[in-house]
Amino acid sequence: VVEDKPNARKAIEDEAKAKKEAIDARTDLTPKAKEDLKAEVDAIADQAKKAVDKATSATDVDKIEEADKAAIKAVGEVKEPVDKTLVKDPANLTDAEKAKLLEEVKKVNPTAKEVKYDEDGNIEVTTQNGDKGTIKPADIVKTEKDLDNGKGGNDINKPIDKVIVKDPANLTDADKAKIVDEVKAVNPNSIVTIDDKGTVTVSTPDGETAAIPAAELVRTKEDTTKPDAGNSKVVKPADKVVGEATDPAAQAKVEEKLKDLNPTAKSVKFDEKGNATVTLNDGTTATIPAKDLFKSPEEAAQPNAGNDIVKPADKAVVKDPANLTDAEKKAIEDKVKAVNPGATVVVDDKGNATVTTPEGKTAVIPATDLTKSPEEAAQPNAGNDIVKPADKTVAANPEKLTDAEKKAIE
């Protein structure tokens, strides 16, 4: 039992009580607005206390408590975007950069009456209630040298896989819960809340709070048929690496895979849990949960090889790997779909397959794992990485194999 838990719960309750008293004392809010804000405070405190109850170390308890303080402090304040804007010189923003900052602030404050620059050069946000808040441009920009800070120049991570929803304009409670879970997975010990518009607010143990607009966290089933599967420009490999998420050797293998699939990657950084943040040269960043990148030896021995997305054993024969025909792409798509029932598969001109499972997992199988030349097909292994037996096993019922039949196949 972590001894600090009772003290942490008490601190969380005191923080919530003080914030609600401050809200009640405000003269610029309607009674309804006050009740809404206080309900938000209660929800944050409740989430923090539940996280404390589940914590297994005093360090985690302390981190949760700090995240709670940041989250409660931010209630009623204007929101800053998680994704900072890449600029050349923060002290001398161009007109285009200034316009981009306004656009990003509007995305995370969708109900604001007005977002503009004030006479001091700060961004002034007028809320629905009529009260005003300001954001210093320096707090929401990053330079090229900031990109290697482990979070792509940001303070908070954004998950790589968007959640598949039926109607982005009308999120269900189940949709919201899934979104919160995805964001929490890449921001350990943080407090994560979601509003009616789908905007997610994240507060970290470092005292940072920022928001992610719904559009950057959700996609539809139709979106998964696009070349990028409706996801980030950052892509992840289908084949996980065997090893511990915190092992440097395993991380080096994952980094190599990620850089192969993301040729414009500037950096790949791992946090203490093994989550990987990939940052591209243009400042685009996304974080991949450790569970999507690493697998145990036991998982690797499972029928799916411990992966969420399965590679077909038999590669497709292509004439020119650099320029696939439509028929060749269709052959690859069919092979991938055959071993990934219900998945959406998009094959590019090089033969790389972007696969999205019904559960919303998206990963890329590189062309080298899916295609072979006619010359390779003539080799003893038929150009495949896994060799199939020439003789099929006789089975009484292919739908229900006996242990003896399984052994014969093995």
Model feature map: region roles:
Residues 1-410:
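Intrinsically disordered, low-complexity segments of exported/surface proteins
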